[in-house]
Structures are given as structure tokens and as C-alpha cells.
């Protein structure tokens, strides 16, 4: 439960909605197929995170809060032949404050975390700029 609590703090977002994803196929090197739903009544809870960590239900966090502010953002890279080591080296070379994770389908998620909340539009602009710079 401790990990679920920590993830709930790190990936805090909307308190009004979250997403779920039920996997129908999970073939590495292909976009994972499944059913995505947006639950418009409540943000993600520790229970949602626990189910996600146990593989019971995929979880999608909406990073934008009710004031249109974010504390984190992500770039989703659906290139399955992506060399993660090269990507990480490029990020380190440019001293970018990013964290790279392999996605379940074999692509990557590149996360940017902030110390203070910022306007969502500013985060989106910066992530687009970074994505273009990384190629």
C-alpha cells in the first residue's frame, strides 16, 4: 500500500476524473489494445493505484487540476524500436529534468516533474518543444 500512496502523491491531478484501461492484448512492440474509459466522478484514489499495481486495472491520471495547473506532464512515445539508452543519453546531454520509463507496449513515457504547480498550457508548450528537440 505504501507504493500506491506514494504514486498517488507523485501523480496527483484532477480530483474530478481519471481514466481506466482494460487490456485486451499486450504484445510487446505493438500499441496495447483494450478499452479505455474516463470516469468523470472522482480522481484516482489509493485503491485505484493498488489495483493498477496488481495488474487488475490500467489507470490514467489527468494531470490538470481544477485550476488548470499541473505538477507533472508526460510525453508518450509510440516508437517500439526506440533505443531507450540513446534517449536517456540525449536527455542527460541536454541536462533536461526528465524521467524515462518503458511503456507497457514497448515505447516510452517521458515524465517532467515540477517543484511548484504551473499553468497546464505552459507545460504542454514546453513538452512539445522538448519532444521536437529530442526528435
Where do the model's predicted regions map?
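DNA replication initiation on ssDNA origins
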Residues: 1-72, 81-87
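A short linear hydrophobic-aromatic micro-motif
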Residues: 59-61, 95-101
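Histidine-centered divalent-metal-coordination microenvironment in nucleic-acid enzymes
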Residues: 75, 98-126
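Anionic group-transfer/hydrolysis microenvironments
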Residues: 78
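Helical (often loop-to-helix) elements that flank the catalytic cores of nucleotide-handling enzymes
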Residues: 84-93, 113-135
Amino acid at each position: 500500500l505504501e507504493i500506491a500512496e506514494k504514486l498517488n502523491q507523485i501523480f496527483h491531478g484532477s480530483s474530478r476524473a481519471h481514466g481506466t484501461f482494460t487490456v485486451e492484448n499486450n504484445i510487446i512492440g505493438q500499441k496495447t489494445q483494450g478499452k479505455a474509459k474516463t470516469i468523470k466522478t472522482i480522481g484516482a484514489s489509493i485503491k485505484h493505484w493498488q489495483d493498477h499495481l496488481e495488474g487488475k486495472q490500467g489507470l490514467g491520471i489527468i494531470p490538470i487540476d481544477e485550476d488548470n495547473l499541473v505538477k507533472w506532464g508526460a510525453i508518450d512515445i509510440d516508437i517500439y524500436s526506440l533505443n531507450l539508452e540513446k534517449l536517456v543519453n540525449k536527455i542527460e546531454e541536454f541536462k533536461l529534468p526528465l524521467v524515462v520509463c518503458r511503456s507497457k507496449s514497448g515505447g516510452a513515457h517521458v515524465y517532467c516533474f515540477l517543484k511548484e504547480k504551473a499553468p497546464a498550457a505552459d507545460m504542454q508548450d514546453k513538452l512539445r518543444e522538448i519532444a521536437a528537440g529530442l526528435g
